[in-house]
Amino acid sequence: ASAVGVDAPVVTFGTYEPKDWVSENLRSFKPISVGRFFVHGSHWDEDLPVAKIGLQVDAGLAFGSGEHQTTKGCLAAIDWVAKRGPRHNALDMGCGSGILGMACAKTWRSTVMMADIDAASVRVAQENARVNKIADLVTAIHSNGFQDTRIRDGGYYDIVCANILA
């Protein structure tokens, strides 16, 4: 510290009571309301607000808990599109947690192809679809962009979601 002209930090040692830090952290995530969507974690034990579509997503290994402004913007865009009529076949490219694909599946009860380059994200998206009771509508696959033929063979997508940095 003295080499760069700052005070040395104070270091203390002690014993702390055991605590479930994962549960504590989950409780800190407040539900998010965007358009028709209400994004909440598994710790939310209250009723959904009237006329809202619930999306249960816990913050974790995959991107997309609803906290980031780009995710909120994408959910708002899906809400806007939903006001203009039904969609039948959706693609969520770079799905992360699957939040956008799940929003499509729950809004239109339509089939959704979800893809991500990260295998852990695909597993999280599949589990989130199961928890949200839409696993029958969702196919989540590991793919580097459009390389997997199942994406190209999925037919015409009438809505494509991609909350990614490219």
Enumerate the language-model features and the residues they cover:
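N-terminal auxiliary segments of SAM/dcSAM-dependent transferases
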Residues: 1-49
